[in-house]
């Protein structure tokens, strides 16, 4: 079986979740809420729409701010997280709105942003 981390993954926002059921994705958002069990959290994207992130194991660290999640979209249009990274915003705040615009452009012009195409020289 192919490891999820090795697959090409689309960058998406919350409005695109339903289009990517059972596909690997990358989602960036601001942490809004952590479920009391620690096995789920909610991120808001650059448009203020929420995406629910499910974890296999409870969080073992505090998270806050901007988080990038890699995972697979479930049938419930949530993301089953394979890995996540917190962005450091100490000196340079992350512009989630601008990032969201870039995600839209990538999807509006797929001919210029091919996904998963390997070129051999």
Swiss-Prot record:
GO biological process, alphabetically ordered: base-excision repair; DNA repair; DNA replication; double-strand break repair via homologous recombination; mismatch repair; nucleotide-excision repair; regulation of cell population proliferation; regulation of mitotic cell cycle
Post-translational modification: Ubiquitinated by RFWD3 at stalled replication forks in response to DNA damage: ubiquitination by RFWD3 does not lead to degradation by the proteasome and promotes removal of the RPA complex from stalled replication forks, promoting homologous recombination.
Keywords: Acetylation, DNA damage, DNA recombination, DNA repair, DNA replication, Isopeptide bond, Nucleus, Ubl conjugation
Pfam families hit by this protein: Rep_fac-A_3 (PF08661)
N-acetylvaline, modified sites: 2
Localization per record: Nucleus
InterPro entries registered for this protein in UniProt: NA-bd_OB-fold, Rfa2
GO molecular function annotation: damaged DNA binding; single-stranded DNA binding
Numbered residues of crosslink Glycyl lysine isopeptide (Lys-Gly) (interchain with G-Cter in ubiquitin): 23, 39, 88
Record Gene3D superfamilies: Nucleic acid-binding proteins
CDD domains: RPA3 (cd04479)
GO CC terms: DNA replication factor A complex; nucleoplasm; site of double-strand break
Family: Belongs to the replication factor A protein 3 family.
Complexes and interactors: Component of the canonical replication protein A complex (RPA), a heterotrimer composed of RPA1, RPA2 and RPA3. Also a component of the aRPA, the alternative replication protein A complex, a trimeric complex similar to the replication protein A complex/RPA but where RPA1 and RPA3 are associated with RPA4 instead of RPA2. Interacts with BRIP1/FANCJ via the RPA1 subunit; following DNA damage they colocalize in foci in the nucleus.
Primary role: As part of the heterotrimeric replication protein A complex (RPA/RP-A), binds and stabilizes single-stranded DNA intermediates that form during DNA replication or upon DNA stress. It prevents their reannealing and in parallel, recruits and activates different proteins and complexes involved in DNA metabolism. Thereby, it plays an essential role both in DNA replication and the cellular response to DNA damage. In the cellular response to DNA damage, the RPA complex controls DNA repair and DNA damage checkpoint activation.
Protein name (database record): Replication protein A 14 kDa subunit
Organism: Homo sapiens (Human)
